[in-house]
Amino acid sequence: MKSIAVTGYKNFELGIFKKDADEAVYIKETIKRHLLPLVEDGLEWVIISGQLGIELWAGDVVAELKADYPIKLAILEPFEKQSANWNEANQLWASEVLEKADYHAFITKRPYESPAQFAARDGFIIDNTDGALLVYDLEKEGSPKFFYDRAIQAKEQSNYYIDCIDFYALQEVVEDMNQTF
């Protein structure tokens, strides 16, 4: 596998409102634990769309991994000015992750017009990656459902790789990390 998309809940869908909240430490560690074996097996690219929450935390994780591994980060935003309506702290977070990216582009080269741009993003990213790592629990629907459904279709048609981190997996990492402190 050469490239993987990482996506999942937006931070506010998880009740997290700061990028460096305590919960973010556990989420980032979980993402790292799922990415690291893939990176060690030759994964070259992690693809995110730059949305708040799981994707930007994944960008932070990839930036950390770059110190020891030849992994690259691509940010493929669904449209121009995605962060224009975000608060200042979130805009800063997005720009910090963007600075760490090896590649950045807009899937539709215009500002937001309709939800179809999100569908175009999902299709483009799935069509141009070998798999996806999702922080998504089927028991708690949210914004990742659209990507998940499309990824499942790709899996059925072409063996698209899907690794879904649910809340039980996150809880295991929390417990594991708290035992080591």
Curated annotation (Swiss-Prot):
Q: Which Gene3D superfamilies match?
A: 3.40.50.450
Question: Pfam families from the xrefs?
Answer: YpsA
SUPFAM superfamilies named among the record's database cross-references: MCP/YpsA-like
Q: Which InterPro entries match?
A: YspA
Q: Which HAMAP family match?
A: UPF0398
The entry sums up its family as follows: Belongs to the UPF0398 family.
This protein's name: UPF0398 protein Lm4b_01906
Q: Which organism is it from?
A: Listeria monocytogenes serotype 4b (strain CLIP80459)
